[in-house]
Amino acid sequence: VLSANDKTNVKTVFTKITGHAEDYGAETLERMFITYPPTKTYFPHFDLHHGSAQIKAHGKKVVGALIEAVNHIDDIAGALSKLSDLHAQKLRVDPVNFKLLGQCFLVVVAIHHPSVLTPEVHASLDKFLCAVGNVLSAKYR
């Protein structure tokens, strides 16, 4: 459960991220595909090379969904309900991939904003990303 302090920390981080959705999202996906190659199986139709327009576009969607979750941090489940349905029922993405994506996103934030990602903020952002992953996995049950 996200505390009031966690919510404040997450919102603070996302003020730094909002203008970089496409770049940070693409970097997160590229990092995930390289670090966890089996995740590429969900994107057989994508050009997975660095700088790919498809990766940039999807990365922007990923970070856009995270921003939507931040904007509705008290109702993440409601904010991401349609996305949860899509991933569970149509795309059938293995839920473990949400955790992997979250880890890669944390690394990207740490690279670009090291002074913001204090241990306390890191813990809050990790809790938030786990909450998002849990919401996206909920419809699998």
From Swiss-Prot:
Q: Which residues form the Globin domain?
A: 1-141
Q: Which domain of life is it from?
A: Eukaryota
Binding-site residues, heme b: H87
The UniProt transmembrane annotation reads none
Q: Which GO terms describe its molecular function?
A: haptoglobin binding; heme binding; iron ion binding; organic acid binding; oxygen binding; oxygen carrier activity; peroxidase activity
Q: Which residues form a coiled coil?
A: none
Q: Supply the SUPFAM superfamilies for this chain.
A: Globin-like
CDD domains from the UniProt entry? Hb-alpha-like
Q: Name one GO cellular component term.
A: hemoglobin complex
Q: Which family does it belong to?
A: Belongs to the globin family.
Q: What does this protein do?
A: Involved in oxygen transport from the lung to the various peripheral tissues.
What subunit structure does UniProt give?
A: Heterotetramer of two alpha chains and two beta chains.
Write down what this protein is called. Hemoglobin subunit alpha-A
The organism encoding this protein is: Trigonoceps occipitalis
